[in-house]
Amino acid sequence: MEIIIIVLGIILDRVTKLWAIKRLSIGEDIVVIKDFFSFSYLENRGAAFGIFKDKQLFLISITMVAILLMMFYLFINKTNPKILKISLSLIISGAIGNLIDRIKYRYVVDFIFFHYKDKYHFPIFNIADVLVSLGTILLIIFIIKEDGYEDRKIFS
């Protein structure tokens, strides 16, 4: 199951990014829902929200280490709960998708743009970002629901 999630996530990310590269040009949006949702091409040379701009070697190195650690944990420990396996698989697939961009282009292709007229603009992102975010949400749910959570008294 884990390998299927990882491979499908990478394929979905690559196909959508290749579409964005071929179909969109910088500054030319495809409006899907007026004043709310469009596709807008962006070459992100940093990480989330543009942090670590032009630090590709650092970002590539950190990403590779994180992927290897997550894969080691995912595939070595066969007794991991299903939600943890899915969570890590989603995060790994998204991390690999953006890693491919960083190595191939020296930037990450972003193209999904939510906004409200000209007043609110959510940062432009891609499918790999969605996979990492969904995986992280599932990981948080797993941590919160894990047995013994109440005994940790984190919030007391």
Curated annotation (Swiss-Prot):
GO terms for biological process: proteolysis. Pathway: Protein modification; lipoprotein biosynthesis (signal peptide cleavage). The keyword Cell membrane applies. Its EC number is 3.4.23.36. It is found in: Cell membrane. It is an enzyme of class 3 (hydrolase). The active site is at D110, D129. The chain crosses the membrane at residues 57-77, 83-103, 124-144. One of its GO terms (cellular component) is plasma membrane. One of its GO terms (molecular function) is aspartic-type endopeptidase activity. It is a multi-pass membrane protein. It catalyses: Release of signal peptides from bacterial membrane prolipoproteins. Hydrolyzes -Xaa-Yaa-Zaa-|-(S,diacylglyceryl)Cys-, in which Xaa is hydrophobic (preferably Leu), and Yaa (Ala or Ser) and Zaa (Gly or Ala) have small, neutral side chains. Disulfide bonds: none annotated. Its main location: membrane. Keywords: Aspartyl protease, Cell membrane, Hydrolase, Membrane, Protease, Transmembrane, Transmembrane helix. Belongs to the peptidase A8 family. This protein specifically catalyzes the removal of signal peptides from prolipoproteins. This is Lipoprotein signal peptidase.
